[in-house]
From Swiss-Prot:
Cell compartments where the protein resides: Cytoplasm
UniProt name for this protein: Glutamine synthetase
Binding partners and assembly: Oligomer of 12 subunits arranged in the form of two hexagons.
EC number, as in UniProt: 6.3.1.2
Cofactor section: Mg(2+)
Annotated source species: Phormidium lapideum
Length: 23
């Protein structure tokens, strides 16, 4: 896995967490 892939996964997880918090 490349650093870019790791960052993209972290961003996806972060967006999901934010969505759950605001819902």
């Amino acid at each position: 896995t490349t650093p870019q892939e790791v960052l993209s996964r972290i961003k996806d997880q972060g967006i999901k967490l934010i969505d759950l918090k605001f819902i």
